[in-house]
């Protein structure tokens, strides 16, 4: 007969779900959560097909993209895009005059300011005066391009100003040539992915010095380059990787089709069906519509992020031999709103820090005031990119961006009080719920403003 040496089978232990147990392997529960999420997504997709049928129609994409449904036979969007070359050339001519001192500092800066203000105002005036000629896509593209040009020319003007100031202050031959925008010439010689190896002995011969950079080739390379910050010497690659280029092209083409399908099949019906509950201030139904819209909208936003910041910008960078491909950081791990805004759009973040935040701090403004100024400029352009194409000036996007300041404080409090994971949850919640709420508000105001309350029932059903 079996008799164990000890009959004891218990010892002091905590349950696995207790914090004190030290157990942290929940891989099975994560798999369970992904499975439930997948099943829920498939159910929503089937519900959409059963309720609305197949709504994807590529012919409608062409109509929307060309603006044929709005009578745009004279293509004002193409005219404005062509005209965008004019302020670029004007900026170069002013800089040439400043470099040889034909134009003095004050008149030159006034000319630059007028040029930039006119650049921003032209789409607003033309779209308002001739609204029937613009498709929504065309107007949005024009506003986007003109906003990018505004930021690029601001950087171009400021960097050349720094170069002029440094040139005038250099009195000793042994001073470092600070007019060169070249970082760390003595870095490692092994450069991956076809990057050019700038050896120190050849660097001086290949670098561009101010004012030799003031020419059409230089400024138009900068205008096309995937960056908002101007430098006299950008890091370059020495070859185009054909396989990498083909992958990015396929991603852009296929991803664009997926985004258009999701818009037509899922987002448009959800937005239209949210109009009446939102107008009647039916909180329960409006909340249900908000949550229903949140999933496809967030999916489109994620795809758009990948298409823009990975596929398209890498595609442009590869074609132009532009070597700095740091277009985004790990924003998905952001523990607070501040970290998110510093991570998800690196070209804009670098521009804001280099050309707005640091100059304001150097002028004696506090860090908080400089941060508010950055959010204010960002809020203005968010509103500009939404209100001008829609011709609906309600400032929802502006207030949403300015609302990031108190939301940032909340997320930092959650991070410090409850840990980084809760701060990250606040970031994701703001992304998932904030965007569809703005979409619903703008669609409601657009219908009321341009169509009228009498037809709200017609535009509130699919």
Where are these regions (language model features)?
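Aromatic/acidic cage segments in peptide-binding pockets
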Residues: 167-171, 400-405
């Amino acid at each position: 007969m079996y008799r164990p040496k000890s009959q004891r089978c218990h010892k002091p232990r905590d349950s696995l779900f207790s914090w004190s147990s030290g157990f942290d392997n929940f891989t099975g529960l994560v798999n369970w959560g992904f499975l439930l999420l997948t099943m829920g997504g498939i159910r929503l997709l089937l519900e959409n097909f059963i309720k609305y049928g197949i709504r994807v129609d590529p012919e409608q994409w062409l109509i929307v993209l060309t603006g044929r449904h709005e009578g745009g036979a004279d293509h004002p969007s193409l005219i404005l895009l062509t005209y965008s070359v004019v302020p670029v050339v004007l900026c170069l001519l002013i800089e040439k005059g400043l470099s040889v001192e034909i134009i003095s500092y004050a008149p030159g800066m006034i000319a630059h300011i007028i040029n930039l203000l006119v650049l921003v105002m032209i789409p607003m005036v033309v779209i308002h005066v001739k609204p029937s000629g613009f498709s929504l896509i065309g107007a949005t593209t024009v506003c986007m391009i003109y906003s990018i040009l505004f930021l690029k020319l601001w950087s171009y003007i400021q960097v050349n100003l720094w170069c002029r100031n440094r040139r005038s202050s250099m009195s000793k031959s042994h001073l470092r040539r600070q007019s060169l925008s070249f970082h760390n010439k003595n870095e490692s010689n092994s450069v991956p992915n076809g990057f050019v190896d700038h050896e120190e002995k050849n660097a001086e011969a290949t670098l561009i010095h101010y004012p030799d950079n003031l020419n059409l080739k230089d400024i138009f390379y900068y205008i096309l380059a995937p960056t908002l910050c101007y430098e006299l010497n950008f890091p370059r690659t020495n070859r185009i990787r054909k396989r990498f280029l083909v992958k990015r092209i396929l991603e852009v083409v296929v991803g664009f089709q997926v985004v258009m399908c999701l818009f037509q099949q899922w987002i448009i019906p959800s937005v239209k069906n949210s109009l009446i509950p939102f107008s009647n201030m039916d909180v329960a139904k409006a909340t249900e519509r908000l949550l229903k819209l949140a999933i496809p909208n967030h999916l489109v936003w994620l795809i758009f992020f990948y298409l823009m910041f990975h596929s398209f910008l890498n595609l442009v960078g590869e074609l132009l031999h532009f070597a700095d491909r740091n277009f985004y950081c790990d924003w998905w791990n952001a523990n607070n709103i501040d970290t998110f805004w510093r991570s998800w759009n690196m070209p804009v973040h670098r521009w804001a820090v280099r050309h707005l935040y640091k100059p304001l701090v150097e002028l004696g403004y506090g860090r908080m005031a400089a941060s508010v100024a950055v959010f204010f400029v960002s809020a203005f352009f968010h509103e500009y990119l939404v209100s001008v194409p829609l011709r609906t000036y309600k400032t929802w996007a502006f207030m949403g961006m300015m609302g990031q300041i108190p939301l940032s404080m909340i997320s930092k409090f959650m991070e410090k009080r409850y840990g980084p994971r809760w701060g990250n949850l606040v970031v994701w919640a703001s992304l998932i719920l904030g965007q569809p709420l703005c979409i619903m508000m703008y669609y409601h105001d657009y219908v009321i403003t341009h169509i009228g309350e009498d037809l709200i029932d017609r535009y509130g059903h699919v």
